[in-house]
Amino acid sequence: MINKNFLEEPNIVDLAKEIFKEVFQNKLEIYTRFSLLSDDLYEADTINFILADGLGYENLNSTDSYLNKNVTKSINTTFPSSTNVALSSISFMKNPIEHGLIGYYMYDKSQYGLINALNWNEDNKNLLLSDHFQKQNSIWKIFKENKIYASNFQPRNLVGTPLSDCLYELSSTIPYDDEQNLLELLSESTILENRFNFIYYPLIDVMAHIFGVNSEEWQIEITKFEKLVNEITNISNKKTKTIISADHGLVNINTENRHDLNYSDDLQIYGDQRSVYINGSKESVLEAFSQIPGVLLEKQELSCLLGEPTNEFLKSIYPDFCFLVEDKNIIYPKHLSAQLNGYHGGLSQEEIKIPIIELSNY
């Protein structure tokens, strides 16, 4: 059974809105549904928001990391639990069905077909220039218009990519090379005057994908991250609040639970490998997934997780069905073949629950 109240529960969009509302010190009206953060947030001169890719609540809780002592709550990430979906939801302060980036892979029925919506290519990146996306204001554009001193720290290889250009303002984006370089940049006098810093940190996710959650390599990365966030929080003499969350957690998938999917060309298979979007006839879908453990959702059930499309653009990317692969299992459609250890995209507690971690120097 799916959680029909999923969209009513606190999620990463609610967290982002609460942070941004305080960045503006209530000078900009931002509607919030919940109070997720500690009261001392309102004392902060500088607010850091670190998005630790892959640092799921259950994953972190399985370690003896000191960060567990600073976890104040766990909330939901987006559905599906994919990086591009969560990052877009933060920047636009909207749920996926509202901003339009609804999966790792998407399928545009009207023009572009299958799209890798994390790594856009020359053939389909112009979809991001459509009216639907261009009419939306990211928080970074709002910061710029309101003269808020804010910086967005991204790994250098991500700056200038189609997704980055869609979500962020180039003038406030600062590339970094590694942890030491990040600390040096945050120590610069102009940055120390910032009201807000957003830091995207991908390495925990990388280690989990390649080596698996709880692997030695993953544990080493957790330890490095602990040290980094402590230094970031104490880098300034100003009152600094650091809030850490994630886009998803990960699950390790054994080789015997990885299923190659055979299907005819009358089906379009996309989305993620744990939450699989499908276009086509129900008969063909049932045949293709007959040997795959999981449950098939039709549009009405899917709307409890994703919401309903409200315009023609959203209807053109909305799937006919979604197959939720059973926990500890994964499928390989025709366009994906990489053999990893850790995966995400599904609805398990490990994937969907993310922590709110709060640190301060006051």
Question: Predicted segments — roles?
Answer:
Residues M1-Y362:
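Feature captures the catalytic ectodomains and active-site-proximal regions of enzymes
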